[in-house]
Every structure is written in C-alpha cells, then in structure tokens.
Amino acid sequence: MAKSKFERNKPHVNIGTIGHVDHGKTSLTAAITKYFGEFKAYDQIDAAPEEKARGITISTAHVEYETPARHYAHVDCPGHADYVKNMITGAAQMDGAILVCSAADGPMPQTREHILLARQVGVPAIVVFLNKVDQVDDAELLELVELEVRELLSSYDFPGDDIPVVKGSALAALEDSDKKIGEDAIRELMAAVDSYIPTPERPVDQPFLMPIEDVFSISGRGTVVTGRVERGIIKVGEEVEIVGIRPTSKTTVTGVEMFRKLLDQGQAGDNIGALIRGVNRDGVERGQILCKPGSVKPHKKFKAEAYILTKEEGGRHTPFFTNYRPQFYFRTTDVTGIVTLPEGTEMVMPGDNVTVDVELIVPIAMEEKLRFAIREGGRTVGAGIVAIESLE
C-alpha cells in the first residue's frame, strides 16, 4: 500500500495524557483512537518504543487521530519516570494535556506531580477525564472527586473552575459495554479538547530567532553566521540583534543563503547562512542568537525544573549539593553555572527531579520554557527547562 500523503488542511495540535499510574491513561488513549483514528489496542500503545532526547532515553508511544476540526498527535508514556523526562526534555511537545483521574481513587501523588510539572514546563491548557465512573455508585462521591481535582488544578495556578471535566469509562468505550459512559464520553472529551485547548501559534508567525552554530568570514562580502531558523522569518535588509555571551548588539542582514542559493528570506525550519553588516569575524560566536530586536533578553540567573539522570542512564553515581558547578548546554553551547538547591533540600540524588536556582558565568539569550542539557565534561547528566515566571 502506498504511503498516504499527510494532508495539511486542518490545524495540528500536540497533546498527551497525564495522571497517576493505573488511572487509565493508556486505555483512554486506545479508546480515543477507536473513535477518531486508526484503532491501536492497549498493548500496542503500552509497548512504547525507546527514543533519545537530549542524550536521555525515554519510552513514549505516539498515536495520531483527528476530529472534524483538528489533527492531533498524542503522546502516552508507560512509566512515571518517562513522563518526568518527557515533560522536561520536551521530547514530545505538548500544546495541551488530558489529565486522567480515576473516580474511584481521586487525585493521587502522581496526579499532583504531573500537574506541577505541567505548570513548570508551561503546558498551556488541561482538560480532565474522570475515568472508571462505573466503579462509583454514589453521585455525591463523584461530585466530591471532581471538586477535589478542580481544587488541585487551581492550587497550581490552572483555572480549576473553568476546566472541562468529562466523566466516563475508557474500558466501557473499548468494550462497547455502556454507550453513555463509553463512546459518548469519549466524543464529549474530544469536543472539549477541540474547544478548550488553544491552537498553537505556528513557528513562522512568531518573532524571528536563529541560534548561531558557525561563523565564517567571506572575503569581500563580510561575515556570515549559520544556523537553523527556530522561528519566524528573516528578510534581507531587516535589522536583527545579536544576543547572549557578550553585550547585545544590532546589525542588518544583507543576504540570506540556503544550499548556496541566494534567497530574499529564510523561515522557521530553514538551515541558512545570514550575511551580517559591519560585524567582523571575531565580533560574533557560536552560542549567541540572531533575533528580532527586543524580542529576547540575555540572562545569567534563572529558576529551572531539572531531571537528573540515574547511574544506569549514564548519569552521575553520586548526589550533588548546593554550589554544584556543571555546564549548561543552551541551544549550541556549554556555559558553566552554579546551582543553588531549594531550602530544605540537602542534596539531589541521581534519578530525582528538582527545582533549582542557577547563575551562569556569562549571560545567555533566554526565555521561559527554553530547554537545556546539564553536562559534565561533555557527558549529559541531566536535562532542564527554564521555569515559567522565573526571569526578571
């Protein structure tokens, strides 16, 4: 059978299931594919392949499906540690999440932890699926669990009162046993996801940013910086800023090249060479960025949510303490930074995830949700993300 062409006629949204172990994340994922995609059974999803992101191995299952309004890529992780790693490395970007909570158990420790992580890594919106409602006979009890979940979401700054909560049973949907809490609930859930989770802004529409990977000097033409445009569009003749490592400076892009051809613009996803005016070869370096003036600021200090690799994952064998000094790999370069642990945290063990304060020795062009690797002499020992609301 020939590979079908990916039709780009609907907006594309990345989502994922989050929540406590055994509350039904994978069953729900299977149930959604039954009505909106190519059916994937529970065990097909549960046997998630391993993949590497920022030097870290993560098991993730990817399924796709579509509603009349949108095309979805959906990620489901088999284990709790995979969720933590996934959300921090951004291996699977989430524009929104479906929080699955068992009506029989109510919110559990990982329910809380996944909501906190979603907050820290900036997942924009959450929709709730209250699963296993057939195991609860008492309507009042069901209302109580819903209230508990809403309060929990509010305590982490999500709008708990406004978030759609859909009650149903993923198992009933898979077994066709009770249409009201089965198929109907799944359809209601996807309608809520369609309307409540915002369509992400496409990278091309965002302000221009290109991490600088290399710098060349071309005799008679000037200095060329190369890299992959992360977002936005750059047109010949536009002014840009060079941000990070050194004081911010302005320049004009006088040429854009791709595959040795001259273009009038470069856009998100393109690997380009940009000719910049009045900057000599040693006035710019790898690790800086080119961006739309005023759109990104350099920072030395930030708060981060980080996951520290276990010994088995190739990480450290020993814990670290306040004043730990690894390298932080941002986009294209390593910068040394000093770590301060939160009050009451004596040390961080391999395998932990933790919120830390970091001060770099030189400033880096930084924004909330920027991801990085933590390295010791070129070896990855952790991954992190700049926490939201953590930059001055």
From Swiss-Prot:
Keyword terms: Cytoplasm, Elongation factor, GTP-binding, Hydrolase, Magnesium, Metal-binding, Nucleotide-binding, Protein biosynthesis
G5: region residues: 169-171
Domain of life per record: Bacteria
Record domain tr-type G: where: 10-201
Disulfide bonding pattern of the chain: none
Localisation: Cytoplasm
Region ranges (G1): 19-26
GO CC annotations, alphabetized: cytosol
The enzyme's E.C. designation: 3.6.5.3
InterPro entries per the UniProt record, alphabetical: EF-Tu_GTP-bd, EF-Tu_GTPase, EFTu-like_2, EFTU_2, G_TR_CS, P-loop_NTPase, Small_GTP-bd, T_Tr_GTP-bd_dom
Chain intervals for the UniProt region annotation (G2): 55-59
GO MF, one annotated term: translation elongation factor activity
Binding, GTP: 19-26, 76-80, 131-134
Enzyme class (EC, first level): hydrolase
Entry annotated with the keyword Transcription regulation: no
Binding site for Mg(2+): 26
Catalytic activity field: GTP + H2O = GDP + phosphate + H(+)
Family label: Belongs to the TRAFAC class translation factor GTPase superfamily. Classic translation factor GTPase family. EF-Tu/EF-1A subfamily.
UniProt subunit comment: Monomer.
Name of the featured protein: Elongation factor Tu 2
Lineage, top ranks: Bacteria, Pseudomonadati, Pseudomonadota, Alphaproteobacteria, Hyphomicrobiales
Underlying gene: tuf2
